[in-house]
Amino acid sequence: MQVIVALAALGSLAAPALGFSIPRGVPVSQSMIDVKLSSTGNSMVKATITNNGNRALNLLKFHTIMDSNPTRKVSIESEDGKEIQFTGMMPTYKEKDLKPSYFISLPPKGTVEHSFDIARTHDLSRGGKFTLKAEGMVPIAEENGTEITGAAKYHSNELHMTIDGEKAASVENAFGIVKRGPLTRINKRTSIDMQSCGNSQELQALTAALKASAQLSSMSAQAVSQNQDKYMEYFKDPQYMQTVQSRFQAVAQESSSTTGGGTTYHCSDTMGGCEEGVLAYTLPSQNEVFNCPIYYSDLPPLSNECHAQDQATTTLHELTHNPAVQEPFCEDNGYGYERATALSAEKAVQNADSYALFANGKLNLITLMLIIDPD
């Protein structure tokens, strides 16, 4: 019976959304906000965000140019066209119960500035000439509200900077080298930092999430070729089918490897990245994943709701951010169903949430519950 249900689920992936998703049907503006980049020092950048509309807006900061965490806010290319390695964090944020502090209020025609040092999240020690630009989509709430009612795309100007490599190297990186305790492969899975797992309940929850991530990823790898309509909904172009399938297979292997994986998973935050609203985060430059307290307190192990977050798919999402799982690793190009399915094929195939959303079909979750706990 379990096998029959599992096969049926492969052809019936739903269309859920993770994270602070933009509700279906809300308007997406191409010109509601303007973002201008300017240089204010050797590696300091100022983003000036302008509300072009005639009404006040509440702009959600998460995964945007305004994010206060050391996330990727701009793309940086050297003079020879090579992308500069990102050394910051890739967080997964909680969708529900958004707080006013997560937003920036912007009056009509008003502006707000956000400054950041790109040397904290990129290796610029070689110095020289660099080209920066920013693009993305900002979830929007009405004035004084926290319910997402729309979104605004932004594309900044290109900023050309000449950076002193020695000065850039003297800037403290947002995250140093991760110090690990003893490593253990729990039930032959990815390496877990046991020193970070002082709470036995957290260790048990992480172990279960890895098992569920492995099974969801394995089923999704099969679904890529068995449900092409659903594949096209998320990834747009059949030429990337093998890439998507191989990434799901890589995540499944990393979650349940019999030979040991390339990532290290931490039950708790040992690097100070768990700011308010962060469920978990990855340091892709080091192949390290960290769970935050609300990963355990606010998420169920598995949800039977299509649009809900849970521990299993959050773990799956984080693993796609690691180059040790598959290169190039996934970015956060679009978060939530509306943003993920609006991406181009080239962006979608490299978007972490596209994989988590595809895997997080309601029937897949119900099937997995039956497989894990048939009683």
Swiss-Prot record:
Record's keyword annotation contains Transport: no
E.C. no: 3.4.24.39
Catalytic activity: Preferential cleavage of bonds with hydrophobic residues in P1'. Also 3-Asn-|-Gln-4 and 8-Gly-|-Ser-9 bonds in insulin B chain
Transmembrane spans: none
InterPro entries: Fungal_M35_metalloproteases, MetalloPept_cat_dom_sf, Peptidase_M35
UniProt superkingdom: Eukaryota
UniProt keyword Protease, yes or no: yes
Active-site feature positions: E318
Co-factor: note: Binds 1 zinc ion per subunit.
Chief site of localization: secreted
Recorded GO MF terms: metal ion binding; metalloendopeptidase activity
Positions that bind Zn(2+): H317, H321, D332
Example GO biological process: proteolysis
Disulfide bonds: C197-C267, C274-C292
Family membership: Belongs to the peptidase M35 family.
PANTHER family reported for this sequence: NEUTRAL PROTEASE 2-RELATED, PTHR37016
Job description of the protein: Probable secreted metalloprotease that shows high activities on basic nuclear substrates such as histone and protamine. May be involved in virulence.
UniProt-recorded name of the protein: Probable neutral protease 2 homolog ARB_05817
Upper classification of the organism: Eukaryota, Fungi, Dikarya, Ascomycota, Pezizomycotina
